[in-house]
Amino acid sequence: MKTLIRPLVVIFAVLTVVTGMAYPAVMTAFGQAVFPAQANGSLIERDGRAVGSALIGQPFDAPRYFWGRLSATAPMPYNAAGSGGSNLGPLNPSLAEQVKARIAALRDAGTDLSKPVPVDLVTASASGLDPDITPAAAAYQIERVAKARKLTADAVARLVAANTTGRQFGVLGEPRVNVLKLNLALDAAQGGH
């Protein structure tokens, strides 16, 4: 029996050190050395203070800001600890009611509903925390943001274009606009913080 227990204890100890301590330490050091911004959460700073992450959606509801995708992390919106979608299928009546309510909220905010509403403005993403919207969703909001900020639509459209990221490696994903970065660029363009 002793001959079986000793090798098991040694293997357990070695694997604990290798997989529980050495490997995580090496990967952490590698991440900090090669990808420091990403390893620390892709934080966006303004005046030396973190204002958010490029990877997590932020709540914006003032007319002067672009609005992101809706959060599915109720009751605390944009709570990364509660990440997850609504799990409502496309034929679920609850989803249809939620979309109708969101379209009504856009109308109440003074958005021109004569154009088709981009789907990402009235639905949540699978994670419920998506930081990006489509260029179509950004274009849909240009008039409202320009009016609220007393800017020309062309000036706001140029900021949208400057903050649009194309497909990764030219083929992966879709073009997207990071809402936090765009809103910070709007503030900076007007001399605000």
From Swiss-Prot:
What family is this protein classified in?
A: Belongs to the KdpC family.
Mention any Pfam family matching this sequence: KdpC
Q: Which GO terms describe its cellular component?
A: plasma membrane
Instruction: Assign the protein's first listed, main location to one coarse class.
Output: membrane
Record keywords, A-Z: ATP-binding, Cell inner membrane, Cell membrane, Ion transport, Membrane, Nucleotide-binding, Potassium, Potassium transport, Transmembrane, Transmembrane helix, Transport
Name the HAMAP family on file.
KdpC
Q: What is the phylogenetic placement of the source species in the record?
A: Bacteria, Pseudomonadati, Pseudomonadota, Betaproteobacteria, Burkholderiales
The entry's protein name is: Potassium-transporting ATPase KdpC subunit
- Span-the-membrane segments of this chain are 7-27
InterPro entries for this protein: KdpC (IPR003820)
Q: Where in the cell is it found?
A: Cell inner membrane
Q: How does it assemble?
A: The system is composed of three essential subunits: KdpA, KdpB and KdpC.
Identify its membrane topology class.
Single-pass membrane protein
Q: Which GO terms describe its molecular function?
A: ATP binding; P-type potassium transmembrane transporter activity
Q: What does this protein do?
A: Part of the high-affinity ATP-driven potassium transport (or Kdp) system, which catalyzes the hydrolysis of ATP coupled with the electrogenic transport of potassium into the cytoplasm. This subunit acts as a catalytic chaperone that increases the ATP-binding affinity of the ATP-hydrolyzing subunit KdpB by the formation of a transient KdpB/KdpC/ATP ternary complex.
Gene name?
Answer: kdpC
